[in-house]
Amino acid sequence: MNTIEKIRLDPITRIEGEITLPGSKSLSNRALLLAALAKGTTRVTNLLVSDDVEHMLNALQTLGIRYTLSQDKRECIVEGACGALAWQNGLSLFLGNAGTVMRPLAAVLCLKGEVRAEVVLTGEARMQQRPIQHLVDALRQAGANIEYLENQGYPPLAIKNTGLIGGKIQIDGSISSQFLTALLMVAPLAESDMQIEIVGDLVSKPYIDMTLAMMRDFGVVVQNNNYQSFFVQAQQCYLSPGQYWVEGDASSASYFLAAAAIKGKVKVNGIGKNSIQGDRLFADVLAKMGANISWGEDFIQAEKSVLRGIDVDLNHIPDAAITIAIVALFAETETIIRNVYNWRVKETDRLSAMATELRKLGATVEEGQDFIRIQPLALTDFETAEIETYNDHRIAMCFSLIALSNTAVTILDPQCTRKTFPNYFAEFEKLWRKN
């Protein structure tokens, strides 16, 4: 594979056109796992082609799930196991830096298997720095047999398939909604009903709504008591819906919508007003900043206007929120993004990384423990910079928008976008209009 060390983006006069989004990473990996656990065969369409989805597919295959993947990898026919997965004792699964694989699999692999076996879940160095203790603590309350192999609270994990009893479980929701998602997805397969109580403030609630909607699509209804507790009936089997279409990735939509709000007009296809993804709300934040936004059943359109800074809590859309930090540079007044501590436990510490890279461009930035304050720049005041991407796909993509200033920008390691959007830069370039 050819490695591209950097990509230089020269100033872009205008952005204009249409883009059709690749499938959502979060939906793709949830759909594959639910299909694997379900009774029946599921055809998953508009699957995202990316590193993270490949990690899920490889793991499921190793765990005995049969599937047929189309030549373009966008459609997968999954034969469900109707319950616990099976593997040879001593198995080790390498899951890269894919949180949407590590967290739910850690829960599912605790289920009682016909043959007792142990599995090790491991990943890249960064994965071993991403906390998982809140999930492990909750699973242990339900009877799980999980051990940390290196650092307490972090992968790699050793898991034995001795079963999940269920019962009353407390889980801390303050760091990542993926922990609750993992627990919810496995709860119907536990031995007794599960009452899940949330400790602390639950972050990224729209991602929980997405999980609950998908569980409904696969035949399981969860009782949600105002996000304070959840009740799940045990000894169920997910039921295949036959076909599951994966919506376009709302987080990936943010770059194109933001580009249009700064300098043009773009119609983003593949996600619309009825999307189950919380990151669709990114468009509402742009609208509050002054962008012209219009919605359809299967599209969102953004058009340039005068942008104002904003003081906003973006806890509910943490992945799309970092794009607002770039839009802030093009606004007329300062922007404060609040309640985003969980940026620090993403693919990199995004609060620190964003502050560092924004300052390279000449921006005045204040980095707090859970907020970032950004002063705007005139189009002519951006400094030429090489942007370090920290092996974080979202940093690479959002900093591409700096080319909408009067200054070129260089993105290091642009291929890190393989995690969710391998051909992002090619798609972005199709919308460029230059003098």
From Swiss-Prot:
Gene Ontology cellular-component terms listed: cytoplasm
Main subcellular localisation: cytoplasm
Signal sequence extent: none
Example of a GO MF term: 3-phosphoshikimate 1-carboxyvinyltransferase activity
EC number: 2.5.1.19
UniProt subunit comment: Monomer.
Protein name: 3-phosphoshikimate 1-carboxyvinyltransferase
Originating organism: Haemophilus ducreyi (strain 35000HP / ATCC 700724)
Name of the gene this protein is made from: aroA
